[in-house]
Amino acid sequence: KKGFSSKEIQKQLGLKRYEPVWAMVHKLRKAMGNRDARYTLEGMIEFDEGYFTVESSEIEQEKGIRGRGAVGKMNTAIMAESTILEDIETGKKSNQCRYFKAKVLTDHTSEQINETIKESISEKSILFSDKSTSYIDIADFVEIHITEKSNKETTTETLRWVHIAISNAKRNFLGNYHKIKGKYLQLYLNEFVYKLNRRYF
């Protein structure tokens, strides 16, 4: 289930040309995304955003934008089904995760967040997020929207699984791919999430 770069696949297959391998792999990633797009997440959902490093042009580097929308960074919505379980003997609570979704965002507006929620999450869900101003309308699209101030506890407990997914995706991309262009980031996320959702298969 480990990812392979197109170069590595070309090498293992003993093919002379790189381009056909690259095109084939991207078609597979697109198919993975189409398959996972057939269903929506339901139940208790963690929602947050992560910024992924992508290749930037020399012109973009010269502009040197910082913060949100920074050069070389792309914003992505990460969603995870998360169920709270309580140990009968100790009373200790823990979160168990099931399925994930990831979608590249072109901006940080509430309109795009709302659209992502509508197409990715069941209306009967309970959604947990931080208190970003972009999330003010989420309650209109789910059963209950619970917000918490963004801090270390939120990252490690309330939104634990989305942050684990973000961290693992970044590590996966860094270890397997030299550079990812922004326009292809969604395809790489498709592959990562597809495999993550089938980790027990």
Model-derived features: where do they sit?
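Residue-level recognition of single "structural anchor" positions
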Residues: 1-201
